[in-house]
Regions:
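Active-site metal-coordination/substrate-binding segment of hydrolases
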Residues: 83-152, 158, 171, 428-442
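Midchain, well-structured core segments that form catalytic/ion-binding scaffolds
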Residues: 157, 164-341
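Acidic/His- and Gly-rich active-site-bordering loop/insert found
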Residues: 2-118, 142-144
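Zn-dependent metallopeptidase/amidohydrolase metal-coordination segment
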Residues: 12, 385-389, 393-460
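Substrate-recognition/cap regions that form aromatic- and gly/pro-loop-enriched pockets
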Residues: 326, 331-402
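Acidic-glycine-rich active-site phosphate/pyrophosphate-binding loop
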Residues: 95-110, 192-193, 198-199, 242-252, ...
Length: 462
Protein backbone atom coordinates (compact mmCIF):
# COMPACT_ATOMS: atom_id res chain seq x y z
CA UNK A 1 0.00 0.00 0.00
CA UNK A 2 1.13 3.55 -0.75
CA UNK A 3 2.25 4.76 2.69
CA UNK A 4 1.92 8.44 1.82
CA UNK A 5 -1.67 7.87 0.74
CA UNK A 6 -2.30 5.79 3.84
CA UNK A 7 -1.09 8.60 6.09
CA UNK A 8 -3.17 11.19 4.23
CA UNK A 9 -6.30 9.09 4.66
CA UNK A 10 -5.63 8.49 8.36
CA UNK A 11 -5.16 12.22 8.94
CA UNK A 12 -8.32 12.99 6.95
CA UNK A 13 -10.40 10.51 8.93
CA UNK A 14 -9.10 11.83 12.25
CA UNK A 15 -9.88 15.39 11.20
CA UNK A 16 -13.39 14.54 9.97
CA UNK A 17 -14.46 11.93 12.52
CA UNK A 18 -16.63 14.14 14.72
CA UNK A 19 -18.44 15.75 11.80
CA UNK A 20 -18.96 12.36 10.15
CA UNK A 21 -20.67 11.08 13.30
CA UNK A 22 -22.82 14.22 13.49
CA UNK A 23 -23.85 13.69 9.86
CA UNK A 24 -24.88 10.10 10.57
CA UNK A 25 -26.92 11.33 13.54
CA UNK A 26 -28.64 13.91 11.33
CA UNK A 27 -29.62 11.22 8.85
CA UNK A 28 -30.71 8.74 11.53
CA UNK A 29 -32.98 11.46 12.94
CA UNK A 30 -35.16 11.21 9.82
CA UNK A 31 -37.82 8.52 10.23
CA UNK A 32 -37.59 7.07 6.74
CA UNK A 33 -39.79 3.99 7.00
CA UNK A 34 -41.77 3.58 3.77
CA UNK A 35 -45.02 5.54 3.85
CA UNK A 36 -47.99 6.34 1.65
CA UNK A 37 -46.96 7.59 -1.80
CA UNK A 38 -47.66 11.24 -2.45
CA UNK A 39 -46.70 13.84 -5.02
CA UNK A 40 -42.94 14.28 -4.97
CA UNK A 41 -42.52 11.35 -2.59
CA UNK A 42 -43.09 8.02 -4.39
CA UNK A 43 -42.33 6.01 -1.23
CA UNK A 44 -43.75 8.39 1.32
CA UNK A 45 -42.60 11.53 3.10
CA UNK A 46 -39.97 9.80 5.25
CA UNK A 47 -37.78 8.34 2.49
CA UNK A 48 -38.07 11.62 0.55
CA UNK A 49 -36.94 13.59 3.61
CA UNK A 50 -33.99 11.23 4.08
CA UNK A 51 -33.00 11.69 0.43
CA UNK A 52 -33.17 15.46 0.83
CA UNK A 53 -31.02 15.29 3.96
CA UNK A 54 -28.45 13.08 2.21
CA UNK A 55 -28.12 15.46 -0.72
CA UNK A 56 -27.91 18.39 1.69
CA UNK A 57 -25.02 16.71 3.53
CA UNK A 58 -23.27 15.95 0.24
CA UNK A 59 -23.65 19.51 -1.02
CA UNK A 60 -22.19 20.73 2.25
CA UNK A 61 -19.07 18.68 1.45
CA UNK A 62 -18.73 20.43 -1.89
CA UNK A 63 -19.98 17.48 -3.92
CA UNK A 64 -22.21 17.90 -6.96
CA UNK A 65 -25.69 16.46 -6.32
CA UNK A 66 -28.70 15.39 -8.32
CA UNK A 67 -32.20 14.36 -7.27
CA UNK A 68 -33.48 11.81 -9.78
CA UNK A 69 -37.17 12.67 -9.65
CA UNK A 70 -37.35 11.80 -5.93
CA UNK A 71 -36.83 8.07 -6.52
CA UNK A 72 -33.10 8.14 -5.97
CA UNK A 73 -30.32 10.71 -5.87
CA UNK A 74 -26.57 10.93 -5.98
CA UNK A 75 -23.50 12.90 -5.08
CA UNK A 76 -20.92 12.95 -7.84
CA UNK A 77 -17.36 13.64 -8.89
CA UNK A 78 -16.45 14.48 -12.48
CA UNK A 79 -14.21 12.26 -14.60
CA UNK A 80 -12.68 12.24 -18.07
CA UNK A 81 -14.67 9.35 -19.54
CA UNK A 82 -17.81 10.77 -21.18
CA UNK A 83 -19.76 7.49 -21.13
CA UNK A 84 -18.65 5.19 -18.32
CA UNK A 85 -18.80 5.88 -14.61
CA UNK A 86 -18.29 4.07 -11.32
CA UNK A 87 -20.87 4.04 -8.56
CA UNK A 88 -21.55 3.16 -4.98
CA UNK A 89 -25.12 2.72 -3.83
CA UNK A 90 -26.53 2.83 -0.32
CA UNK A 91 -30.10 3.32 0.83
CA UNK A 92 -31.58 5.79 3.27
CA UNK A 93 -34.93 4.11 3.85
CA UNK A 94 -35.18 1.86 6.91
CA UNK A 95 -37.30 -1.02 8.17
CA UNK A 96 -40.03 -0.34 10.73
CA UNK A 97 -38.83 0.11 14.29
CA UNK A 98 -40.43 -2.94 15.88
CA UNK A 99 -40.31 -3.64 19.60
CA UNK A 100 -37.63 -3.93 22.26
CA UNK A 101 -35.80 -0.62 21.90
CA UNK A 102 -34.33 0.86 25.07
CA UNK A 103 -34.28 4.42 23.67
CA UNK A 104 -35.66 6.48 20.79
CA UNK A 105 -34.60 4.66 17.58
CA UNK A 106 -34.28 7.95 15.68
CA UNK A 107 -31.99 9.64 18.18
CA UNK A 108 -28.52 8.26 17.56
CA UNK A 109 -26.56 7.36 20.68
CA UNK A 110 -22.90 6.55 21.20
CA UNK A 111 -21.96 3.94 23.79
CA UNK A 112 -18.57 2.29 24.31
CA UNK A 113 -17.46 2.94 20.74
CA UNK A 114 -20.73 1.88 19.12
CA UNK A 115 -23.42 3.85 17.32
CA UNK A 116 -27.00 2.94 18.25
CA UNK A 117 -30.09 3.87 16.25
CA UNK A 118 -32.24 2.73 13.36
CA UNK A 119 -30.10 2.79 10.23
CA UNK A 120 -26.65 3.21 11.79
CA UNK A 121 -25.65 -0.10 10.17
CA UNK A 122 -28.37 -0.49 7.53
CA UNK A 123 -27.68 1.72 5.68
CA UNK A 124 -27.37 5.34 6.77
CA UNK A 125 -23.99 4.95 8.45
CA UNK A 126 -22.48 3.40 5.30
CA UNK A 127 -24.17 6.09 3.17
CA UNK A 128 -22.35 8.82 5.06
CA UNK A 129 -19.11 6.82 4.93
CA UNK A 130 -19.24 6.75 1.12
CA UNK A 131 -19.88 10.49 0.98
CA UNK A 132 -16.75 11.06 3.05
CA UNK A 133 -14.79 8.81 0.68
CA UNK A 134 -15.82 11.05 -2.23
CA UNK A 135 -15.09 14.15 -0.15
CA UNK A 136 -11.50 12.96 0.30
CA UNK A 137 -11.04 12.41 -3.43
CA UNK A 138 -12.40 15.88 -4.14
CA UNK A 139 -10.26 17.63 -1.53
CA UNK A 140 -7.11 15.88 -2.74
CA UNK A 141 -7.78 17.08 -6.28
CA UNK A 142 -7.66 13.71 -8.04
CA UNK A 143 -8.23 13.85 -11.80
CA UNK A 144 -10.48 10.85 -12.24
CA UNK A 145 -10.67 8.67 -15.32
CA UNK A 146 -14.25 7.64 -14.58
CA UNK A 147 -16.83 9.88 -12.92
CA UNK A 148 -18.03 8.51 -9.58
CA UNK A 149 -21.57 8.64 -8.26
CA UNK A 150 -22.54 7.86 -4.67
CA UNK A 151 -26.14 6.81 -5.20
CA UNK A 152 -28.72 7.13 -2.41
CA UNK A 153 -31.74 4.86 -2.75
CA UNK A 154 -35.08 5.23 -0.99
CA UNK A 155 -36.88 1.91 -1.53
CA UNK A 156 -34.37 -0.84 -0.79
CA UNK A 157 -36.11 -2.38 2.20
CA UNK A 158 -39.33 -3.18 0.37
CA UNK A 159 -39.29 -3.46 -3.42
CA UNK A 160 -36.13 -1.77 -4.77
CA UNK A 161 -38.29 0.03 -7.30
CA UNK A 162 -36.05 3.08 -6.91
CA UNK A 163 -33.11 1.42 -8.62
CA UNK A 164 -35.39 -0.06 -11.27
CA UNK A 165 -36.52 3.49 -12.04
CA UNK A 166 -32.94 4.72 -12.11
CA UNK A 167 -31.75 2.04 -14.51
CA UNK A 168 -34.69 2.68 -16.85
CA UNK A 169 -33.96 6.41 -17.01
CA UNK A 170 -30.19 6.70 -16.49
CA UNK A 171 -27.25 4.70 -17.87
CA UNK A 172 -25.95 1.89 -15.68
CA UNK A 173 -22.49 2.25 -14.12
CA UNK A 174 -19.55 0.30 -15.52
CA UNK A 175 -19.18 -1.15 -12.04
CA UNK A 176 -20.99 -0.56 -8.78
CA UNK A 177 -20.56 -1.68 -5.21
CA UNK A 178 -23.10 -1.39 -2.45
CA UNK A 179 -22.02 -0.94 1.18
CA UNK A 180 -25.06 -2.83 2.45
CA UNK A 181 -23.69 -6.19 3.58
CA UNK A 182 -20.57 -7.66 5.15
CA UNK A 183 -16.89 -7.39 4.39
CA UNK A 184 -14.87 -8.58 2.57
CA UNK A 185 -16.72 -8.82 -0.81
CA UNK A 186 -19.96 -10.60 -1.63
CA UNK A 187 -19.78 -11.80 -5.23
CA UNK A 188 -23.06 -13.70 -5.26
CA UNK A 189 -26.53 -13.51 -3.75
CA UNK A 190 -29.10 -16.21 -3.27
CA UNK A 191 -32.37 -16.06 -5.11
CA UNK A 192 -35.28 -14.28 -3.46
CA UNK A 193 -38.71 -15.87 -3.04
CA UNK A 194 -41.68 -14.17 -1.43
CA UNK A 195 -45.34 -15.12 -1.09
CA UNK A 196 -48.37 -15.10 1.19
CA UNK A 197 -50.09 -18.14 2.67
CA UNK A 198 -53.79 -17.24 2.85
CA UNK A 199 -56.64 -18.94 4.71
CA UNK A 200 -60.28 -19.27 3.68
CA UNK A 201 -62.74 -17.05 5.56
CA UNK A 202 -62.67 -18.67 8.99
CA UNK A 203 -65.33 -17.20 11.34
CA UNK A 204 -63.99 -19.45 14.06
CA UNK A 205 -62.24 -19.37 17.41
CA UNK A 206 -59.53 -16.89 16.40
CA UNK A 207 -60.78 -13.31 16.68
CA UNK A 208 -57.43 -11.63 15.93
CA UNK A 209 -53.94 -12.78 15.06
CA UNK A 210 -50.98 -10.52 14.35
CA UNK A 211 -47.21 -10.49 14.44
CA UNK A 212 -44.18 -9.02 12.72
CA UNK A 213 -43.42 -5.63 11.21
CA UNK A 214 -41.60 -6.59 7.99
CA UNK A 215 -41.72 -9.52 5.60
CA UNK A 216 -37.94 -9.87 5.68
CA UNK A 217 -37.46 -9.93 9.45
CA UNK A 218 -38.05 -12.68 12.01
CA UNK A 219 -40.58 -11.25 14.50
CA UNK A 220 -39.93 -11.30 18.24
CA UNK A 221 -43.58 -10.70 19.16
CA UNK A 222 -46.90 -12.10 17.98
CA UNK A 223 -50.33 -12.51 19.51
CA UNK A 224 -53.75 -14.04 18.96
CA UNK A 225 -57.09 -13.20 20.58
CA UNK A 226 -59.22 -16.34 20.89
CA UNK A 227 -62.68 -17.20 22.21
CA UNK A 228 -61.97 -19.38 25.24
CA UNK A 229 -61.75 -19.46 29.03
CA UNK A 230 -58.27 -18.78 30.41
CA UNK A 231 -58.76 -21.41 33.12
CA UNK A 232 -58.72 -24.11 30.42
CA UNK A 233 -55.31 -23.13 29.07
CA UNK A 234 -51.88 -24.47 29.96
CA UNK A 235 -48.69 -22.50 30.42
CA UNK A 236 -45.98 -22.90 27.78
CA UNK A 237 -42.43 -21.60 27.29
CA UNK A 238 -42.23 -18.10 25.76
CA UNK A 239 -46.03 -17.75 25.88
CA UNK A 240 -48.06 -15.41 28.10
CA UNK A 241 -51.83 -15.48 28.60
CA UNK A 242 -54.03 -12.49 29.41
CA UNK A 243 -57.82 -12.22 29.75
CA UNK A 244 -59.22 -9.79 27.20
CA UNK A 245 -62.93 -9.14 26.81
CA UNK A 246 -64.72 -12.45 26.43
CA UNK A 247 -61.54 -14.24 25.41
CA UNK A 248 -57.82 -14.64 25.97
CA UNK A 249 -54.86 -12.83 24.43
CA UNK A 250 -52.05 -15.30 23.71
CA UNK A 251 -48.67 -13.66 23.24
CA UNK A 252 -45.53 -15.26 21.87
CA UNK A 253 -42.08 -13.88 22.73
CA UNK A 254 -39.25 -14.73 20.38
CA UNK A 255 -35.94 -13.35 19.16
CA UNK A 256 -35.77 -11.14 16.07
CA UNK A 257 -33.29 -11.10 13.21
CA UNK A 258 -32.86 -10.78 9.45
CA UNK A 259 -34.57 -13.22 7.09
CA UNK A 260 -31.29 -13.95 5.32
CA UNK A 261 -29.60 -15.01 8.57
CA UNK A 262 -32.28 -16.72 10.68
CA UNK A 263 -29.89 -18.89 12.67
CA UNK A 264 -30.35 -18.23 16.38
CA UNK A 265 -33.68 -16.45 15.98
CA UNK A 266 -36.98 -17.56 17.52
CA UNK A 267 -40.07 -16.76 15.46
CA UNK A 268 -42.85 -15.53 17.73
CA UNK A 269 -45.49 -16.32 15.09
CA UNK A 270 -44.43 -19.96 15.12
CA UNK A 271 -44.76 -20.02 18.92
CA UNK A 272 -48.33 -18.71 18.77
CA UNK A 273 -49.34 -21.02 15.90
CA UNK A 274 -47.99 -24.05 17.76
CA UNK A 275 -49.82 -23.03 20.94
CA UNK A 276 -53.11 -22.61 19.11
CA UNK A 277 -52.80 -26.05 17.51
CA UNK A 278 -51.50 -27.83 20.61
CA UNK A 279 -54.43 -26.52 22.67
CA UNK A 280 -57.17 -26.97 20.08
CA UNK A 281 -57.88 -23.24 19.85
CA UNK A 282 -59.28 -23.37 16.32
CA UNK A 283 -62.18 -24.70 14.31
CA UNK A 284 -61.58 -27.18 11.51
CA UNK A 285 -60.96 -24.53 8.84
CA UNK A 286 -58.51 -22.72 11.08
CA UNK A 287 -56.82 -25.96 12.11
CA UNK A 288 -56.19 -27.01 8.52
CA UNK A 289 -54.74 -23.58 7.73
CA UNK A 290 -52.58 -23.41 10.84
CA UNK A 291 -51.21 -26.89 10.13
CA UNK A 292 -50.07 -25.54 6.76
CA UNK A 293 -48.48 -22.49 8.39
CA UNK A 294 -46.80 -24.73 10.96
CA UNK A 295 -44.92 -26.38 8.08
CA UNK A 296 -43.42 -22.98 7.22
CA UNK A 297 -42.29 -22.44 10.80
CA UNK A 298 -41.06 -26.00 11.31
CA UNK A 299 -37.57 -25.24 10.00
CA UNK A 300 -35.72 -22.21 8.64
CA UNK A 301 -34.13 -24.65 6.16
CA UNK A 302 -37.51 -25.30 4.52
CA UNK A 303 -37.85 -28.95 5.48
CA UNK A 304 -41.45 -28.54 6.57
CA UNK A 305 -42.39 -27.29 3.10
CA UNK A 306 -40.18 -29.75 1.23
CA UNK A 307 -38.06 -27.00 -0.34
CA UNK A 308 -34.80 -27.62 1.56
CA UNK A 309 -31.66 -27.88 -0.58
CA UNK A 310 -28.07 -26.62 -0.64
CA UNK A 311 -25.23 -26.03 -3.11
CA UNK A 312 -21.51 -25.23 -3.06
CA UNK A 313 -21.42 -21.47 -3.70
CA UNK A 314 -24.37 -20.57 -1.49
CA UNK A 315 -25.01 -23.29 1.07
CA UNK A 316 -28.53 -24.08 2.32
CA UNK A 317 -31.84 -22.45 1.49
CA UNK A 318 -33.44 -20.38 4.26
CA UNK A 319 -37.08 -19.44 4.80
CA UNK A 320 -38.99 -17.48 7.45
CA UNK A 321 -42.50 -16.19 8.08
CA UNK A 322 -42.20 -12.46 8.68
CA UNK A 323 -45.75 -11.19 9.23
CA UNK A 324 -49.15 -12.64 10.08
CA UNK A 325 -52.37 -10.64 10.10
CA UNK A 326 -56.13 -10.87 9.52
CA UNK A 327 -58.06 -9.10 6.81
CA UNK A 328 -61.74 -9.57 5.93
CA UNK A 329 -61.93 -12.79 7.92
CA UNK A 330 -58.87 -14.36 6.29
CA UNK A 331 -55.46 -14.95 7.83
CA UNK A 332 -52.38 -13.91 5.84
CA UNK A 333 -48.90 -15.28 6.58
CA UNK A 334 -46.02 -13.82 4.59
CA UNK A 335 -42.94 -15.86 3.76
CA UNK A 336 -39.42 -14.89 2.69
CA UNK A 337 -36.96 -17.43 1.31
CA UNK A 338 -33.37 -17.06 0.10
CA UNK A 339 -32.53 -19.94 -2.23
CA UNK A 340 -29.36 -21.35 -3.84
CA UNK A 341 -28.82 -22.54 -7.41
CA UNK A 342 -30.19 -26.04 -6.74
CA UNK A 343 -33.77 -24.80 -7.05
CA UNK A 344 -35.79 -22.00 -8.65
CA UNK A 345 -38.93 -19.99 -8.12
CA UNK A 346 -41.16 -22.22 -10.26
CA UNK A 347 -40.04 -25.41 -8.54
CA UNK A 348 -40.45 -23.88 -5.09
CA UNK A 349 -43.96 -22.67 -5.91
CA UNK A 350 -44.99 -26.18 -6.91
CA UNK A 351 -43.39 -27.75 -3.83
CA UNK A 352 -44.95 -25.26 -1.42
CA UNK A 353 -48.43 -25.60 -2.92
CA UNK A 354 -48.15 -29.38 -2.62
CA UNK A 355 -47.06 -29.07 1.02
CA UNK A 356 -49.83 -26.64 1.96
CA UNK A 357 -52.62 -28.81 0.59
CA UNK A 358 -56.20 -27.62 0.28
CA UNK A 359 -56.38 -25.71 3.55
CA UNK A 360 -54.29 -22.74 2.46
CA UNK A 361 -53.69 -20.79 -0.74
CA UNK A 362 -50.32 -19.50 -1.95
CA UNK A 363 -50.69 -15.97 -3.33
CA UNK A 364 -48.60 -13.04 -4.57
CA UNK A 365 -45.56 -15.14 -5.45
CA UNK A 366 -42.43 -13.22 -6.44
CA UNK A 367 -39.06 -14.71 -7.30
CA UNK A 368 -35.64 -13.47 -8.41
CA UNK A 369 -32.96 -15.95 -9.40
CA UNK A 370 -29.49 -16.07 -7.76
CA UNK A 371 -26.53 -14.21 -9.30
CA UNK A 372 -22.80 -14.95 -9.13
CA UNK A 373 -19.65 -13.14 -10.36
CA UNK A 374 -16.34 -14.97 -10.64
CA UNK A 375 -14.00 -14.15 -7.76
CA UNK A 376 -11.00 -13.54 -10.03
CA UNK A 377 -12.58 -10.75 -12.09
CA UNK A 378 -10.54 -7.49 -11.97
CA UNK A 379 -13.09 -5.43 -10.04
CA UNK A 380 -13.57 -8.14 -7.43
CA UNK A 381 -9.81 -8.43 -7.01
CA UNK A 382 -9.49 -4.65 -6.59
CA UNK A 383 -12.01 -4.73 -3.76
CA UNK A 384 -10.78 -7.85 -1.96
CA UNK A 385 -7.12 -6.89 -2.23
CA UNK A 386 -7.85 -3.46 -0.79
CA UNK A 387 -9.75 -4.95 2.11
CA UNK A 388 -6.98 -7.41 2.91
CA UNK A 389 -4.23 -4.78 2.72
CA UNK A 390 -6.05 -2.36 5.00
CA UNK A 391 -7.06 -4.98 7.57
CA UNK A 392 -4.11 -7.36 7.35
CA UNK A 393 -6.47 -10.26 6.75
CA UNK A 394 -6.42 -12.92 4.04
CA UNK A 395 -10.15 -12.97 3.42
CA UNK A 396 -11.89 -14.46 0.39
CA UNK A 397 -15.04 -13.34 -1.42
CA UNK A 398 -18.24 -14.94 -0.18
CA UNK A 399 -21.86 -15.41 -1.17
CA UNK A 400 -24.92 -14.69 0.96
CA UNK A 401 -28.66 -14.91 1.33
CA UNK A 402 -29.27 -11.19 1.71
CA UNK A 403 -30.72 -9.40 -1.28
CA UNK A 404 -29.04 -6.08 -2.07
CA UNK A 405 -29.13 -3.56 -4.89
CA UNK A 406 -26.19 -5.42 -6.48
CA UNK A 407 -28.44 -7.96 -8.18
CA UNK A 408 -30.17 -5.20 -10.15
CA UNK A 409 -27.03 -3.89 -11.87
CA UNK A 410 -25.19 -5.45 -14.83
CA UNK A 411 -21.90 -5.60 -12.89
CA UNK A 412 -22.06 -5.06 -9.14
CA UNK A 413 -21.22 -6.55 -5.75
CA UNK A 414 -21.86 -5.76 -2.12
CA UNK A 415 -18.79 -4.57 -0.24
CA UNK A 416 -19.01 -4.18 3.55
CA UNK A 417 -19.09 -2.55 5.96
CA UNK A 418 -20.50 -5.12 8.42
CA UNK A 419 -18.19 -7.66 10.08
CA UNK A 420 -20.11 -10.88 10.54
CA UNK A 421 -17.67 -12.29 13.12
CA UNK A 422 -17.69 -9.18 15.31
CA UNK A 423 -19.81 -9.90 18.41
CA UNK A 424 -22.44 -7.34 19.28
CA UNK A 425 -22.31 -5.70 22.70
CA UNK A 426 -24.99 -6.64 25.22
CA UNK A 427 -26.66 -3.28 24.69
CA UNK A 428 -26.65 -3.52 20.87
CA UNK A 429 -28.69 -5.36 18.29
CA UNK A 430 -28.42 -6.43 14.64
CA UNK A 431 -29.66 -4.84 11.44
CA UNK A 432 -33.49 -4.88 11.40
CA UNK A 433 -33.48 -5.60 15.15
CA UNK A 434 -33.97 -3.50 18.26
CA UNK A 435 -31.06 -1.29 19.36
CA UNK A 436 -29.38 -1.59 15.94
CA UNK A 437 -25.66 -1.05 16.46
CA UNK A 438 -22.56 -0.25 14.39
CA UNK A 439 -18.93 -0.04 15.60
CA UNK A 440 -17.39 3.38 15.04
CA UNK A 441 -13.86 2.13 14.38
CA UNK A 442 -15.00 -0.29 11.68
CA UNK A 443 -17.11 2.38 9.99
CA UNK A 444 -14.12 4.72 9.87
CA UNK A 445 -11.96 1.90 8.55
CA UNK A 446 -14.56 1.41 5.81
CA UNK A 447 -14.01 5.01 4.68
CA UNK A 448 -10.35 4.19 4.08
CA UNK A 449 -11.19 0.94 2.28
CA UNK A 450 -13.66 2.70 -0.02
CA UNK A 451 -11.22 5.50 -0.87
CA UNK A 452 -8.46 3.10 -1.87
CA UNK A 453 -10.81 0.70 -3.66
CA UNK A 454 -12.30 3.51 -5.75
CA UNK A 455 -8.82 4.68 -6.76
CA UNK A 456 -7.95 1.14 -7.85
CA UNK A 457 -11.21 0.71 -9.72
CA UNK A 458 -10.36 3.91 -11.60
CA UNK A 459 -7.36 2.06 -13.11
CA UNK A 460 -9.36 -0.85 -14.57
CA UNK A 461 -10.39 -0.96 -18.23
CA UNK A 462 -14.15 -1.45 -18.08
Amino acid sequence: MDQALNQKIDAYIAQNKEQLLKDIAALVAVNSVEGTPEEGAPYGAGPRAALDKTLELAAGMGLATRNCENYIGYAGLAGKDPEKYLATICHVDVVPVGNGWTADPFTMRIQDGWLLGRGVADDKGPMVATLYALKFLKEQGYELRYPIRALAGTNEETHMQDVDYYLKNYPAPAFCFTPDAEFPVCNGEKGLFGAKIVSPVCNGVIVEIEGGVANNAVPDRASALVKTDISKLKNAPNITLEPEGDGVRIRGWGKSGHAAMPQGTVNAIGLVVNYLLDNGLCNETERTYLEAVRKLHASTAGEGLGINCADGPFGPLTVIGGRIYMEDGRIFQTMDSRFPTCTNGKKMTEQIRAALGDGAELRDVTAAEPFYIEADSPAILACINTYNEVTGENAKPFTMGGGTYARHFPYAVSFGPEHVDLPLPEFGGPMHGANEAAPIDKLLEAVKIYIIALLRLEEIDF
